[in-house]
């Protein structure tokens, strides 16, 4: 049986995934933008327009996701059907544990608004995790713990101590003030979705609290390495 060139081209397209469909490391996925990276963590921001998919991408570390938008998404693991829609809103978070050597998937924004998320990936799991907690743990994986602060206007979180480096994420726009036990204060206006990596040297610590000195409610998430 003879097969024409046009028919052969169709067969090749159907049976061999195109280059754009092949998984890439998450840092190379076009919509995942690396905004901070050091030897300990990589912080990426994904903004996915409504109706669009990311490229299939590969995660090779434990990670934390902090949601910054109100929409719905689906997850599709490599070579598996697309999963159900999952609504998200600002302040939702998840601490994900890598099972095996890697995890490959893509994300589909099935909502009507852009999907924005901060993805924090940890270079390696600690050989000796810290047993000291800064606050009640909202979620954790083998590499990190999440502390979630919901601050009404004028509210102050309890004083707490970090003994490991951490990433502080502002879920909402607010006027934030940090106070230390010796009376020092530092205030700044932070925008929704902004973050900062805070270094805590081995054997050291950093004690502070968080105060919302503005007139609207705020949310802060601290992601502390173990």
Language-model features: where?
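Asparagine-centered strand-capping/turn motif at beta-strand->loop junctions
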Residues: 106-111, 160, 208-214
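Glyoxalase I/VOC metalloenzyme domain signal
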Residues: 20, 101, 112-116, 120-127, ...
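Surface-exposed beta-loop interaction hotspot
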Residues: 97-99, 104-153
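Glycine- and acidic-residue-biased ligand/ion/polar-headgroup-sensing regions
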Residues: 60-79, 163-182
């Amino acid at each position: 049986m003879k097969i024409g060139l046009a028919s052969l081209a169709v067969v090749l397209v159907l049976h061999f995934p195109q280059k754009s469909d092949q998984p890439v490391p998450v840092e190379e996925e076009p919509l995942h933008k690396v905004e901070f990276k050091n030897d300990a963590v990589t912080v990426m921001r994904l903004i996915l327009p409504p109706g669009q998919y990311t490229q299939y991408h590969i995660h090779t570390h434990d990670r934390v996701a902090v949601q910054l938008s109100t929409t719905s998404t689906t997850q599709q693991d490599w070579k598996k059907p697309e999963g159900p829609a999952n609504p998200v809103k600002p302040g939702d978070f998840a601490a994900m544990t890598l099972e095996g050597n890697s995890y490959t998937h893509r994300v589909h924004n099935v909502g009507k608004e852009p999907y924005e998320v901060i993805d924090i990936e940890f270079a390696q799991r600690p050989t000796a995790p810290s047993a000291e907690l800064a606050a009640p743990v909202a979620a954790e994986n083998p590499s990190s713990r999440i502390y979630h602060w919901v601050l009404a206007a004028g509210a102050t979180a309890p004083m707490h101590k970090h003994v490991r480096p951490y990433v502080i994420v502002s879920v909402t726009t607010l006027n934030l003030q940090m106070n230390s036990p010796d009376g020092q204060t530092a205030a700044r206006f932070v925008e929704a979705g902004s973050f900062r990596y805070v270094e805590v040297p081995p054997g050291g610590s950093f004690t502070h609290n968080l105060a919302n000195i503005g007139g609207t409610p705020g949310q802060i998430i601290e992601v502390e390495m173990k």
